[in-house]
A protein has these predicted regions:
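Short, membrane-interfacial amphipathic segments enriched in basic
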Residues: 1-32, 212-213
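Selective transmembrane-helix segments that form parts of the transport pathway or gating/packing helices
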Residues: 42, 46, 50, 89, ...
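Generic alpha-helical transmembrane segments of integral inner-membrane proteins
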Residues: 50-55, 142, 146, 150, ...
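Hydrophobic alpha-helical transmembrane segments of multi-pass membrane transport proteins
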Residues: 77-120, 148, 208
């Protein structure tokens, strides 16, 4: 039963996403609403992204640096950290953070509007709910997800470099040379793959959260249930998509 509901929800989300993309191509975008959503998914989520990026870079660096230093190849620390972060940890952790911060807000906002009949009122005014409510949220996530991902990668690398220099005596120039041109180094292909993942994840987060919000029925209790369901389904879908994209991009 759970699997049936999962695929039913996923199909419904894809339909809503398709409708939103159709409105986007037709140029039916409210700039004011888009700006509001950009503020929520951008600056509103920036602090948790930066803090987690610093923590992830430091922890990853501790694990890698301790092993490489004992093997006498500490000059490769920067490259391994950069590649590991760009290919996997930055897009996936950023998506997880955005799910917790933004998807919950989308599902709760639209769910509340649904149970208080505000969406029906929008429809009666001959305004398409998907155009008015989903399009700005989808666009904001597609725009801000790669930006947040790049910021996450940047602070992770800087925290890793500082930790390597202080505790493992790796000169900054050695660390950054490894990032750019070591045996394992960060390439444009890695960055492209990271941005592709972040855009796809942002798209999934927005359409799934909006679908749960728009289909909420009942009262305040059901709004909470929809919000929880949106987070769970988003995390599962993003994880599965990450496996698929990793195989396509690096397999």
């Amino acid at each position: 039963m759970y699997y049936f509901d999962f695929f039913k929800r996923l199909l419904s989300s894809l339909v809503i996403g398709g409708q939103a993309i159709n409105f986007i191509f037709k140029g039916k975008i409210s700039k004011n609403d888009l700006f509001d959503q950009l503020m929520e998914s951008g600056p509103g989520s920036l602090l948790i992204v930066l803090i987690t990026g610093i923590a992830a870079g430091t922890v990853f660096n501790i694990q890698v640096a301790s092993q490489l230093t004992s093997m006498g190849v500490s000059s490769e620390i920067g490259g391994l950290l950069a590649v590991g972060m760009a290919r996997e940890m930055a897009p996936l952790l950023t998506a997880t953070l955005m799910t917790g911060k933004v998807a919950t807000a989308y599902a709760a906002q639209l769910g509340t509007m649904k149970v208080t009949e505000q969406i029906e009122a929008i429809t009666m005014l001959r305004t398409e709910p998907v155009q008015y409510l989903v399009v700005p949220r989808l666009l904001s996530m597609v725009i801000m997800s790669p930006i947040q991902c790049l910021l996450f990668l940047s602070v992770a690398l800087w925290s890793g470099q500082i930790w390597s220099t202080i505790f493992y005596k790796v000169p900054p120039i050695v660390f950054w040379t490894s990032v750019r041109s070591g045996n394992v180094s960060l390439t444009s292909a890695d960055l492209t793959a990271m941005l592709i993942k972040s855009v796809v994840f942002g798209l999934l987060i927005s359409i799934i959260a909006c679908e749960y919000g728009l289909t909420t029925k009942g009262g305040p209790k059901e709004v909470g249930t929809s919000t929880t369901g949106a987070v769970v389904m988003t995390l599962v879908t993003v994880s599965l998509m990450d496996v698929l994209l990793t195989q396509i991009l690096f397999g």
